[in-house]
Amino acid sequence: VLGTDSNFLDSSNYFTFDYRQDNLVTAVNVSDKDAIDPIMYSDEFRLNYFYEVFKSYLWGLNRIEEQDVSKLVRSYIKTIKTDIHDRLQLNTIRTIKCHPSGPCLAGVNRLFVTVEGDFFPCERVNETSKAYNIGNLDEGFWYDKSYELLNIGKLTERECRECWAINFCNCCAAGIEEGDKLSRKKRLEKCKSNKHVVEERLKEYCTLREYGCKFED
C-alpha cells in the first residue's frame, strides 16, 4: 500500500531493483473510503507514478524491456487487457434479462470470518454493517443475504439497463452501505466514478491499439 507521504520513486526502485527479483509485487494506493480528510498526493508522487505508467505503455508496444518498467505498475497493461480488451471480445448482446458485471459470488473466493464467527464476503467490506453479514459459524451461510449482495443491480435497475458501461462495470457491494442497508444513492455515486475510470481506460486502450499494441498476445 503506497502512502501519500512517499514520492513513489523510492518504493518503485526498492521493489524493482533491490527486492528479490523473482518475487511478484503489486501495489495499491491508500483507500479514501471513510477517510476523515481527503487523500492528497504530491506533485512529485504523481510525476514519478505516471512516468512509470508511460513506460508500461512503451513496454506494451515492445519499445522497452520488461525489466525497465517498475514492478509496481507492470500489471497496468494487463489490467487494460482484462478490463477492456477481454470484455470487448465477449460480444455480449443485451437481452431482456441482464446484469452488470462487478459483483462477486459473496464468500466464495475471499470469505472473511470475524473473531466472533460472523461471515462477510471479503476483507474489503464494513464488518460493522449488518448489510454485509452473510452468516456465521453456528448457522452457516445465509443464502438470501449472499443473493442480495450479488444482485445489487436491483438497487439501480433502470440506470443499469440504460448504462453504456454495464459490461465494464466494476462496482461491487463494498462501500455502498448506509447503516445496515445497501444504499441506492451511494451505488449511483460509485457508478459515476466507475464510468469515468472506464472512459479513461477505453482511451488508453484505443491509443495503444492504434500504435500497435497486441492485446491478443
What are these regions (language model features)?
Residues C104-G107:
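Short, small/polar residue-rich loop motifs at catalytic or cofactor-binding pockets
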Residues E116, K130, L155-D217:
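Radical SAM enzyme core and accessory elements
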